[in-house]
Amino acid sequence: MIRICPIVRSKVPLLGTFLRSDSWLAPHALALRRAICKNVALRSYSVNSEQPKHTFDISKLTRNEIQQLRELKRARERKFKDRTVAFYFSSVAVLFLGLAYAAVPLYRAICARTGFGGIPITDRRKFTDDKLIPVDTEKRIRISFTSEVSQILPWKFVPQQREVYVLPGETALAFYKAKNYSDKDIIGMATYSIAPGEAAQYFNKIQCFCFEEQKLAAGEEIDMPVFFFIDPDFASDPAMRNIDDIILHYTFFRAHYGDGTAVSDSKKEPEMNADEKAASLANAAILSPEVIDTRKDNSN
């Protein structure tokens, strides 16, 4: 019987049967064994033996060869460090670029929720029923209205009432009037602010023309409403004790279209859906008498 190596016998058990001298498959099995032993390198060492390591005796190298090896090693380390530093600075640059793009909408979102920076609160989750109950107090807050128009916008934009007086928790409706003096249809967008800024956290707008862009045809004139209330917590805040006057200021800019969306010098607020608009109009029945009287005076 032809002898085969133990590794081949363990890997291919039937090969021993085929290698018997009386088997007609012996020549073919022998050729197969040689191919297996050659490919898996089983001729000279067993399966438990480790793969030979390629080593060399450094003492046989010349001084120049050793110096070249050291230079090669330092070059590889320097290349790795340079690549790491480049990756680090690229990551930092991308991070700051992303923060720069997200800073403006993030700032406006925070201001819309907290009233920071003189931005009135527009978070509709705060418009609960308990917030719309007027506080029983004799102190009314004077709300003054001001306006401004961008120099490149040929509009006239003015408040229809100079001021109204409201109680904390009392809803109020005011109007602005806008007219397009050009011979072309123009789309405008309004930004707003509250003064003093610390009172902005209590100024809540339920419905406002500034929530969406406004399109005026050539020569068209329209009334623009703003429906708002002062949070009842205003009356109990010691920091608001000496604040009797609040100014609501609007600035209109011309909208420009780049990628199909309108943009101005300031991002507009998210547009309310149909249900929210319907709820706002339904609440308009609770109006301040001062606003109604002022509205009538202006119409007369």
Curated annotation (Swiss-Prot):
Domain of life: Eukaryota
Gene: COX11
GO molecular function terms noted in the UniProt entry: copper ion binding
Membrane topology: Single-pass membrane protein
Subcellular location: Mitochondrion inner membrane
Gene Ontology biological process terms from the UniProt entry: aerobic respiration; cell redox homeostasis; mitochondrial cytochrome c oxidase assembly; protein-containing complex assembly
Species, as recorded: Saccharomyces cerevisiae (strain ATCC 204508 / S288c) (Baker's yeast)
The keyword Oxidoreductase appears for this protein: no
Protein name listed in UniProt: Cytochrome c oxidase assembly protein COX11, mitochondrial
Protein role: Exerts its effect at some terminal stage of cytochrome c oxidase synthesis, probably by being involved in the insertion of the copper B into subunit I.
